Amino acid sequence: MSEEKKYELWLDNYFFKPNFWQKCLAFVLLPLSVLYAFFAILNTFFRKKIVFKKPVISVGNLSFGGNGKTPLCKAIAREFDGVFIVLRGYKRKSKGLFVVKNQNEILCTLAQSGDEAMEYAFEENVKGVIVSEDRVKGIKKAFELGAKIVVLDDAFSKFHIKKFDILLESKIKPYFNFILPSGSYRLPKFYERRADFIALEGRDFLRYSFVKKNLKAVLVTAIAKPFRLYEHFIKARACYFFKDHYEFKKEELENLLKKHNCDTLMLTFKDFVKVKDFGFKCQIIELNIELKDSLREKIKTYIKEFEQ
């Protein structure tokens, strides 16, 4: 196991299943967490509120890492017409605003968009995708291009934007309710009161995934919290976990297949968009979310406010 992978595993345990020494470290780092909290809270004030004349929905979470934001955004796009996704485009090799997709046409490369944005671009029900560090510019561009609804991926902390805030709450909670670096929260937990709707897994949405068993496949993934795929680990001959947003190299994947005498890569769609041009046989792990009536009706009510 590489040093990078060991660090990822250590960090995962530190936030969710800490041992005695990791718990001690969390308390030692509390003064830094207080300082971080001060600046994080300060950053949410003193900015003019920006209001749009069309629906803007944000899907986010308080803790760092994957909680299912991408499949939930895609689920919203399947339920409502004319949805554009606006996101930062983490780990992309570009800066500024890029239109990744417009009206079912992909307009840039994976390097320019980042893996998450390109995953959205391949979703038929998502009509447009825009990456921009400045979410306000991204929203304006989306509406210029004909968006009926803008969904923001991971923008809960953008309190200067008037929007319908959906805060995801996973079944798997951090061990401590501390913020970084003592815990995994990016803002104090009391900030969840600022959400318009707290979406609880099992109550407001159902998460499910599917892939057929294939012992000629090697499971590789570079998503946050790969333990979410635990039910599929036994369906492949071997499993390898990489850092979130990791850029796969063709040679290393070839070596993994040869090592285990396999001919197929088993991966999520987010991983697939990064290897699709390598020529490997791939088997996609379908990760989906189904909205329950409680959340669906809240979104419908919000959208209807703009039809009056």
Swiss-Prot record:
Reaction it catalyzes: a lipid A disaccharide + ATP = a lipid IVA + ADP + H(+)
Entry's Gene Ontology molecular function annotations: ATP binding; tetraacyldisaccharide 4'-kinase activity
Gene Ontology biological process terms in this record: lipid A biosynthetic process; lipopolysaccharide core region biosynthetic process
Enzyme superclass (EC): transferase
Keyword hit for ATP-binding: yes
Keywords: ATP-binding, Kinase, Lipid A biosynthesis, Lipid biosynthesis, Lipid metabolism, Nucleotide-binding, Transferase
Catalytic activity, EC: 2.7.1.130
Pathway(s) the chain acts in: Glycolipid biosynthesis; lipid IV(A) biosynthesis; lipid IV(A) from (3R)-3-hydroxytetradecanoyl-[acyl-carrier-protein] and UDP-N-acetyl-alpha-D-glucosamine: step 6/6
InterPro entries with a match to the protein in the record: LpxK
Residue numbers binding ATP: S63, F64, G65, G66, N67, G68, K69, T70
GO CC, any one term: plasma membrane
This protein's record includes keyword Chaperone: no
PANTHER family assigned to the protein according to its UniProt record, in alphabetical order: TETRAACYLDISACCHARIDE 4'-KINASE, TETRAACYLDISACCHARIDE 4'-KINASE, MITOCHONDRIAL-RELATED
Family note: Belongs to the LpxK family.
Free-text function comment from the UniProt entry: Transfers the gamma-phosphate of ATP to the 4'-position of a tetraacyldisaccharide 1-phosphate intermediate (termed DS-1-P) to form tetraacyldisaccharide 1,4'-bis-phosphate (lipid IVA).
The protein, known as: Tetraacyldisaccharide 4'-kinase
